[in-house]
């Protein structure tokens, strides 16, 4: 009886840990900027004043200055 209780506690702990890690990984934002020869794509970024200043400097390879 004690062994099955211990297994249940371990299983419950594993599930709670998994759900906590899943929540933490989904709540963190990851900023991705993809620049190709034809366009650029911005995904998942916080648009702060500094980031907007950076984004204004982005140029694709085929664009004219």
Curated annotation (Swiss-Prot):
Major localization class: host cell
Intracellular or extracellular location(s): Host endoplasmic reticulum membrane
Q: Provide the transmembrane region boundaries.
A: 4-24
Q: What more is known?
A: TGBp1, TGBp2 and TGBp3 seem to act together for cell-to-cell propagation. TGBp1 is the main movement protein that physically cross the plasmodesma with the viral genome. TGBp2 and TGBp3 would facilitate TGBp1 function.
Q: Which family does it belong to?
A: Belongs to the Tymovirales TGBp3 protein family.
Task: Output the Gene Ontology cellular-component terms.
Answer: host cell endoplasmic reticulum membrane; membrane
Q: Which InterPro entries match?
A: TGBp3 (IPR003411)
Which residue stretches are annotated as topological domain Cytoplasmic?
Answer: 25-65
Q: Which domain of life is it from?
A: Viruses
Name a single GO biological process. transport of virus in host, cell to cell
Asked whether the UniProt record includes Oxidoreductase among its keywords, one would answer no
Q: What is this protein called?
A: Movement protein TGBp3
> For side Lumenal, which residue ranges?
1-3
Q: Which UniProt keywords apply?
A: Host endoplasmic reticulum, Host membrane, Membrane, Transmembrane, Transmembrane helix, Transport, Viral movement protein
Task: Explain the purpose of this protein.
Answer: Plays a role in viral cell-to-cell propagation, by facilitating genome transport to neighboring plant cells through plasmosdesmata. May induce the formation of granular vesicles derived from the Endoplasmic reticulum, which align on actin filaments.
**Covalent S-S links between cysteines:** none
């Amino acid at each position: 009886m004690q062994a099955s209780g211990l297994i249940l506690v371990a299983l419950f702990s594993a599930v709670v840990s998994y759900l906590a890690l899943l929540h933490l990984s989904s709540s963190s934002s990851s900023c991705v900027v993809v620049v190709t020869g034809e366009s650029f794509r911005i995904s998942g970024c916080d648009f702060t004043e500094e980031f907007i200043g950076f984004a204004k400097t982005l140029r694709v390879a085929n664009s004219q200055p």
